[in-house]
Amino acid sequence: MPIIESSIQRERLNKAERAVRAPQISAYRTAVKNFEKAAAAGADNLQELFSKTSAAIDKAETKNLIKKNKAARDKARLYKLLKAATSK
C-alpha cells in the first residue's frame, strides 16, 4: 500500500488504464486466435477474416498496445497462413 500521495495517484491511474487496455488487448488476441483456428479448419472466408484480423492488429498498434515490429511480424505470419491455406 503506497504512502506517498503521488504513488497513490499513480496506482489509481494505472488501475484505470489497465481497465481500458485489457479488453482491447483481449479483442486483438481473440481476432488472431479466430483466424488461426479458421485457417487450421480450412474455412471458406479466410480472406475476409484476414482483413478483419489485420485491422485489429493495426488498431492495437495505433493504440500502442503492441509495438510496430510485433504488428508487422504478426501480420506476416497470418499472411503466410492465409497463403498456405488457400493454395491447398
From Swiss-Prot:
The keyword Lipid biosynthesis does not apply. InterPro entries: Ribosomal_bS20, Ribosomal_bS20_sf. One of its GO terms (molecular function) is structural constituent of ribosome. One of its GO terms (cellular component) is ribosome. It comes from the Bacteria. Belongs to the bacterial ribosomal protein bS20 family. Binds directly to 16S ribosomal RNA. This is Small ribosomal subunit protein bS20. The gene is rpsT.
